[in-house]
């Protein structure tokens, strides 16, 4: 009986810790919506450090950095988002934004490649 009770307690503790909620990401999203890109960037970085396997924080981090006219820095955040992305829709968004970064840098060859990759992940995009 003691072993069963111990097993149940251990299982519950793992389930609770595995479902830790990211409280920083919604705050960062609010700041981004309010055009507080520096604050949003900081909170996206915190969110990504707490949950490094998730895609949303590095993708949104790239967007916040891009809005601050730091395209070169945004590339690194988008690259990190690509590492964790499994969804074709999300990969499309990341590649599209990478294409925008390369266009801003006047790196047209890489921009075309990024846009092609975006279309490969979502062929119906116009």
Identify the function of each model-found stretch:
Residues 22-23, 56, 90-93:
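Start-of-helix register in tetratricopeptide repeats
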Residues 47, 81-84, 118:
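Canonical positions in the second alpha-helix
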Residues 52, 86-89, 123:
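Short coil turns that delineate tetratricopeptide repeat
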């Amino acid at each position: 009986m003691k072993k069963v009770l111990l097993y149940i307690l251990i299982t519950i503790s793992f389930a609770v810790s595995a479902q830790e909620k990211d409280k920083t990401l919604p705050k960062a999203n609010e700041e981004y919506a309010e055009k507080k890109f520096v604050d949003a960037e900081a909170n996206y970085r915190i969110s990504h450090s707490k949950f490094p396997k998730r895609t949303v924080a590095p993708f949104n981090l790239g967007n916040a950095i891009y809005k601050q006219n730091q395209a070169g820095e945004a590339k690194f955040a988008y690259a990190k988002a690509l590492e964790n992305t499994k969804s074709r829709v999300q990969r499309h968004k990341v590649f599209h934004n990478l294409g925008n970064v390369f266009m801003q840098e006047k790196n047209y060859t890489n921009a075309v490649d990024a846009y092609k990759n975006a279309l490969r992940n979502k062929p119906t995009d116009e």
